[in-house]
Amino acid sequence: MIVINIKENEPIDKALKRFKKKFEKTGVLKALRARSYYEKKSVRLRKEVIRASYRLKLQEAASND
């Protein structure tokens, strides 16, 4: 359960923004979307390999700059 303490005289926009950040960090929505349909283990592993290679490319590009 996510708890946000609203400070005195704090605009609701800022409190809502903090709530959204905390909610995004927990990864609840991401997990919910991932479980919305069944995904075979081989497909999941293939996606992980693709993501890992993409991150590696980004790291190499950043180190070359």
UniProtKB/Swiss-Prot annotation:
<keyword id="KW-0687">Ribonucleoprotein</keyword>
<keyword id="KW-0689">Ribosomal protein</keyword>
<dbReference type="InterPro" id="IPR038380">
    <property type="entry name" value="Ribosomal_bS21_sf"/>
</dbReference>
<protein>
    <recommendedName>
        <fullName>Small ribosomal subunit protein bS21</fullName>
    </recommendedName>
</protein>
<dbReference type="GO" id="GO:0003735">
    <property type="term" value="F:structural constituent of ribosome"/>
</dbReference>
<comment type="similarity">
    <text>Belongs to the bacterial ribosomal protein bS21 family.</text>
</comment>
<dbReference type="InterPro" id="IPR001911">
    <property type="entry name" value="Ribosomal_bS21"/>
</dbReference>
<dbReference type="InterPro" id="IPR018278">
    <property type="entry name" value="Ribosomal_bS21_CS"/>
</dbReference>
<dbReference type="GO" id="GO:1990904">
    <property type="term" value="C:ribonucleoprotein complex"/>
</dbReference>
<dbReference type="GO" id="GO:0006412">
    <property type="term" value="P:translation"/>
</dbReference>
<dbReference type="Pfam" id="PF01165">
    <property type="entry name" value="Ribosomal_S21"/>
</dbReference>
<dbReference type="GO" id="GO:0005840">
    <property type="term" value="C:ribosome"/>
</dbReference>
